[in-house]
Amino acid sequence: MLTVDFARLGLQPGDRVLDLGCGAGRHAYEAMRLGGRVVAFDVDAAAVKDTAVVMEACDGDGAAVNGDALRLPFPDGAFDRVVAAEVLEHIPGDTVVIAELSRVLRPGGVLAVTVPRWGPELANWALSDEYHTVPGGHIRIYRASALASRLSDAGLVVEGRGYAHGLHAPYWWLRCLVGVGNDSHPLVRAYHEVLCWDIERRPVVSGVTRALDAALTPFIGKSLVLYARQP
């Protein structure tokens, strides 16, 4: 499940790519598939270890690195493309992280940043205190204009905006209503199965879910994506 549109990111074979906050590695693997030389970076050592195992089994050039986004261990201009997906909403020092992302992006390079979209995320916070008080969880909600201003303040030129995951916003509203940790609720289980069918591109079902996702995403897509260039 990709949040970033790699066509808009403009990744070319041989590009040096940083996936900051890689988590399970979904964007890192796609960047490798497209021929990028990828560094998957995360503060979670266990996630980095798991991602490294998958990378070793894949064709391509990839490495997984454990570290702190506030102090990236890379030289200035080290990367042609940078992805930071669903990361900034977790970090108190978000402006420091953005400055680091700008620093390691070469002139002419492109950054894709994704965060939870303001409207759907605001609904989650309103429906459940548990959703946003969990340790390591979301500590802020971004308006698109505020995030764009932070990127501009770091010297980047915002060139585009997108949204993703229209089917996922209602899923999280449901989870907030029945209890964020209540994975066994029958409605949650049924909805999750539908999302899995969509991700797995099951015949017939995925055609319906993708049509629904395309219709819903402009209005309630769970994620906001901004694309910015280093001048």
Predicted regions span which residues?
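Conserved N-terminal segment of class I S-adenosyl-L-methionine
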Residues: 1-75, 81-85, 95-98, 139, ...
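A short hydrophobic/small-residue beta-strand
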Residues: 38, 111-112
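Residues lining the SAM
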Residues: 85-88, 114
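Short, glycine-/aromatic-enriched active-site segment of Class I SAM-dependent methyltransferases
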Residues: 113-140, 148-149
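Short alpha-helix
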Residues: 139-154, 161
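Conserved catalytic loop of SAM-dependent methyltransferase domains
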Residues: 160-197, 222-223
